[in-house]
Design a protein with these regions (language model features):
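General alpha-helical segment detector with a strong preference for membrane-spanning helices
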Residues: 7-9, 33, 98-100
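Acceptor/aglycone-binding surface of glycosyltransferases and processive sugar-polymer synthases
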Residues: 10-91, 118-137
C-alpha cells in the first residue's frame, strides 16, 4: 500500500516492487542511509514521528527505522498469515502489522526511499499536535496490552479511552 498523498513517488514504489522477490515484505524508509527527502516534514511532525518510532521500537523490539512511512509492500502469503489477527487501527496499525509479521518469522526489508512532504495534505500535524501525541501513545499502549498477559484488560481500557475521547 502507499499513502494517498503521493509523498512516495511511483518511481520509488517501483523500487519496492523490484525487491519483493527477495523477501516477504518491503517497507520504504525516510530514516536510513540512502533516503532522499525532497522536502522534509515540519519540525513538530518530525519530532512526533521520531518519538513514536523510538517508542514503538522499544515496546515491540522492532528493528525498523521508519515504521510509519506510507509505502509498504507484502506478499499475499504474509498478509494472509496475519490479517485475521490484526487488532489495531489508527496510528499503531503499521506497528501491529510489522510486529505480527516479524513474530511469525517473515523477512521484511527496509529500503531507502525518495520522499516529499506534502504541505497541502489534509492531515495537518501542527494543528493537531497536542491531541495526536496522546492518541499515538495510547495506540501503542493498547497494542502492547494486546500482546501481553494483560490482554483481557484491553476491553476495560477501550471503554475508558472511549469515554475520554467523547469528552
Amino acid at each position: 500500500y502507499v499513502d494517498a498523498d503521493a509523498s512516495t513517488k511511483p518511481e520509488a514504489f517501483a523500487e519496492l516492487i523490484k525487491k519483493i522477490g527477495e523477501s516477504d515484505g518491503v517497507i520504504a524508509s525516510r530514516k536510513i542511509r540512502g533516503a532522499t527527502l525532497v522536502k522534509k516534514e515540519p519540525f513538530l511532525q518530525r519530532f512526533g514521528s521520531r518519538g513514536f518510532n523510538l517508542l514503538a521500537r522499544a515496546m515491540f523490539g522492532l528493528p525498523f527505522s521508519d515504521t510509519q512511512c506510507g509505502a509498504k509492500l507484502f506478499t499475499r502469503k504474509a498478509i494472509e498469515a496475519v490479517l485475521p489477527e490484526l487488532g489495531i487501527t489508527e496510528f499503531a496499525f503499521d506497528v501491529d502489522l510489522l510486529y505480527r509479521l516479524t513474530k511469525k518469522g517473515f523477512k521484511i526489508l527496509e529500503l531507502p526511499t525518495t520522499w516529499e512532504h506534502k504541505a497541502g495534505a489534509k492531515f495537518n500535524f501542527a494543528q493537531r499536535f497536542w491531541k495526536l501525541i496522546p492518541n499515538m501513545f495510547m495506540s501503542l499502549c493498547r497494542l502492547r496490552l494486546l500482546y501481553s498477559p494483560l490482554k483481557d484488560v484491553v476491553r476495560a481500557y477501550d471503554l475508558t479511552i472511549g469515554k475520554l475521547k467523547r469528552r
